[in-house]
Amino acid sequence: MTEPTQPQAAVAADENQIVAERRDKLRALRDQGIAYPNDFQPTHHAAGLQTEYADADKEALDAKALDVAVAGRMMLKRVMGKASFATVQDGSGQIQFFVTPADVGAETYDAFKKWDLGDIVAARGVLFRTNKGELSVKCTELRLLAKALRPLPDKFHGLADQETRYRQRYVDLIVTPETRATFRARTKAIASIRKFMSDADFMEVETPMLHPIPGGAAAKPFVTHHNALDMQMFLRIAPELYLKRLIVGGFERVFEINRNFRNEGVSPRHNPEFTMMEFYAAYTDYRWLMDFTERLIRQAAVDALGTATIRYQGRELDLAKPFHRLTITQAIQKYAPNYTDGQLSDDAFLRGELKRLGVDVTQPAFLNAGIGALQLALFEETAEAQLWEPTFIIDYPIEVSPLARESDTVAGITERFELFVTGREIANGFSELNDPEDQAARFRKQVEQKDAGDEEAMFFDADYIRALEYGMPPTGGCGIGIDRLVMLLTDSPTIRDVLLFPHLRRED
């Protein structure tokens, strides 16, 4: 473990001294029998008071004499002889307490002067406006509800260390308004999506998190063991195959918002545990899905932010405009126009070009790759990162789309799309393959790839084939990455910024 630097050691020593002093204060409270009371009920919240009485002047407030009870964390304290002020932050915002010994009593006032920033405090009093115009609570009763033993970060610098922000999210939420705003926007976006789906007659369902066979995506699963059944289980990588079983069962529109788990790397776009929404609608296809997904994302932005025009990393993005649609080769030639049609159909050229771009074409996934898979790999290297405006990339090759319906007009191509915004995949959808014999053949091909060393290739799911053999209506299905969508809406450069508790290395 790395030894702390001299400044770090000094800070730690100072903090230890502060904690020791605060523990002494807590010990005194315990001796008095008033350490952690639990009998205070707020009648108002800071933001509600600030909003409702924003335009009320001092005379109007004095005439109204509104009694309030407010509780929260003390973020700032100014002791000024016979009158003191405290800025208190609750879950909605901040409001000022005005404290005098004449109003709360000399004993309470003396105790208040010893309270620390970070303490949870409560007051009853009358709402008024100070001579400087600050909306405040003139306290007639003041109590300490919970003692903070650890000091808050310096109010001018906050949490400067990014990893500490993620590791101690509870502190980050206390001191960083932008973090609180991000997660409120996330909640609004998800609520918007749920309402949008309900209004479109979708039924929300829950499917298993523990799978006997991982499926529904090309990914490496987490493996666990069920002791009572003595069987290997997998944390789900996707709910797709279970949701389509429900389509077979007669639920014609279903969706699920829940966690997926993939035992893969961590990056600004990837976390091993992440939130997805998948939805399936009978008697639809990928064209319907694209239109529906576009409207859903636009509405989520409006409900979360109040507008469909957003800013991401300094650039404006108008989600109200129609989303673009390009095939894989069209996208390559738009952003790398030197490639000819002939080159993009030449196996040897594509492999050579991928190698030149730093792709390891000897890995198992490339050993038997066809033209379509090679084109997709080239797209990922040359075009994907440049898809700033919302763009549906359509018509994916069948060899990388084992669950998607093949095109009726172009051999080797499926009715599949992926949606990219700001160079990042947000959604993936397709007309579902509902032919059980074709699906079984594709599963067998996936098993061959897995046997050849491709860890992300799919397993053969015999029960899913059995479900298809009962007959599944024509269906469209789509998955939307909720975390990546929230990144977009909140101008967050990394997925860790939109996860309350992202995965990190152990502290030791």
UniProtKB/Swiss-Prot annotation:
Keyword Nucleus (UniProt): no
Major localization listed first in the record, in broad terms: cytoplasm
Family affiliation: Belongs to the class-II aminoacyl-tRNA synthetase family.
Top EC class, one word: ligase
Primary gene name: lysS
Keyword tags: Aminoacyl-tRNA synthetase, ATP-binding, Cytoplasm, Ligase, Magnesium, Metal-binding, Nucleotide-binding, Protein biosynthesis
EC number from the UniProt entry: 6.1.1.6
SUPFAM superfamilies referenced in this protein's UniProt entry, alphabetically: Class II aaRS and biotin synthetases, Nucleic acid-binding proteins
InterPro entries: Aa-tRNA-synt_II, aa-tRNA-synth_II, aa-tRNA-synth_II/BPL/LPL, Lys-tRNA-ligase_II, Lys-tRNA-ligase_II_N, Lys-tRNA-synth_II_C, NA-bd_OB-fold, NA-bd_OB_tRNA
Name this polypeptide is given: Lysine--tRNA ligase
Residues annotated for Mg(2+) 1 binding in this entry: 418, 425
NCBIfam families: lysS_bact, PRK00484.1
Cofactor: Mg(2+)
Assembly and binders: Homodimer.
Binding site for Mg(2+) 2: 425
Alphabetized GO MF terms: ATP binding; lysine-tRNA ligase activity; magnesium ion binding; tRNA binding
